[in-house]
Amino acid sequence: MQNEPLTPGYHGFPARDSQGNQEPTTTPDAMVQPFTTIPFPPPPQNGIPTEYGVPHTQDYAGQTGEHNLTLYGSTQAHGEQSSNSPSTQNGSLTTEGGAQTDGQQSQTQSSENSESKSTPKRLHVSNIPFRFRDPDLRQMFGQFGKILDVEIIFNERGSKGFGFVTFENSADADRAREKLHGTVVEGRKIEVNNATARVMTNKKMVTPYANGWKLSPVVGAVYGPELYAASSFQADVSLGNDAAVPLSGRGGINTYIPLISLPLVPGFPYPTAATTAAAFRGAHLRGRGRTVYGAVRAVPPTAIPAYPGVVYQDGFYGADLYGGYAAYRYAQPATATAATAAAAAAAAYSDGYGRVYTADPYHALAPAASYGVGAVASLYRGGYSRFAPY
């Protein structure tokens, strides 16, 4: 009664061998011993070929089938079922191992494909020869891969000595950077680096007035200093130092600009309000304060024997307005007439660099309010500008 459940199992093993099973008869010792010698399968790693993964899965699968047979096989039915289990388990585990390695290979191939189809990369090339043009730069970098775009930066004087090369593949761009960085081309050591995006700031123009004015009174005082020097207009003297200049804005809107309160220099021939404001009106609204300033400064004022040296001793406007006075005001006698002083002022009327303005047609006595944009631009591009870089 004690061993009756196990008796069919023990008698069933020889019968199973007689059916053609090739597996050896297992003993209780064989049931326990193989577990201590079975190595644990290594974890899956990317890039391991199929031959490394399949043999381990086969050995482990076969041993697993034997132990499943001895441990859980108690009847003939279980024995028959387990007799077919090693092959099925071997096949299933082999297919799983093959699928796993195939998945790993496909994963590595997909990663390589994605790497080869990466985003374009832009290189910054500096210190290139000035005679280089886009085809020259494309020929120099074209040996490393497909180039999408080549651009050399120019200004009005020619090449600035640097440019950009955009590769379709970032790997080609890195290889070109490693090979060409530091090489000498026509005596110049070129530098190839990864291009970085420039941070662009949007500068918005501030419009301080609701009627569309873009030139503030402070800037207007720079371009038309005669208008803002003081409350010096003959028509506004009766109003005191807090006078205002009425200027017609857009749409017929009158705008009053308060004048800067400065003390009047006695005896100085300030321009009248009618002529100066008439020349200033309209041109100021169109941003042409420079032309009005040139029209006002072209008229040499009358000579003053005791001219006070307190007005506009600045290096820029002082040289244009009053540069001539310093040359002759001390040399003239106290009884000098207005005609001789005006002639001396016209002869010495220069900007301090030896260039006389009398020969310039834009500095004539004609009103300058009707000049076009081209003429205004020519004033800035003239030979007398001290701020021209070259």
Curated annotation (Swiss-Prot):
- Annotated site (Interaction with RNA): 122, 130-131, 155, 160, 164, 188, 198
Q: Name one GO molecular function term.
A: DNA-binding transcription factor binding
Q: Name the domain of life.
A: Eukaryota
Check the record and name the SMART domains matching this protein: RRM
Q: Name one Pfam family in it.
A: Fox-1_C
User: Residues bearing Omega-N-methylarginine?
Assistant: 281, 381, 386
Query: What name does UniProt use for this protein?
Result: RNA binding protein fox-1 homolog 2
What is this protein's gene name? RBFOX2
